[in-house]
Every structure is written in structure tokens, then in C-alpha cells.
């Protein structure tokens, strides 16, 4: 009977460790996805911030040529 208890505790412990590792990997993956989304948003903001100066430069170039 003691052998069965030890085996059961060992199985439960290993299952708990495995579950903990899976949860940690899942959390890391979610953090990486969030970081990627934030990077994409900041790049979009930078591009949109430059857009007015690009447009005004193009307009002034067209005025000089036309």
C-alpha cells in the first residue's frame, strides 16, 4: 500500500511540474505576442507621424515643377 501511495504522489508531482512548465511557456508566448503588437503599433505611429511631412514635401516639389 505504501508503494502505491509513493507512486501516486510521484505521478501527481510530475504532472504538477509538467503543468507548471506548460503554463510558463504559454505566458512567455503571450508576452512575446503582446510585445510584437506594441512594436507594430509604435512603427505605425512613427510612419503616420512622418506622413504629413512627406506629403508637404511632395506638394512643394510639385509646385516647383508645375
From Swiss-Prot:
| Post-translational modification Leucine amide, affected residues | 65
Subcellular localization: Secreted
Q: In which tissues is it expressed?
A: Expressed by the skin glands.
Q: Which InterPro entries match?
A: Frog_antimicrobial_propeptide (IPR004275), FSAP (IPR016322)
Q: Name one GO biological process term.
A: defense response
The principal localisation class reads secreted
What Gene Ontology cellular component terms go with this record?
A: extracellular region
Kindly indicate where the leader peptide sits in this chain: 1-22
Quote the protein name from its UniProt record: Phylloseptin-H9
Its gene name is psn-11
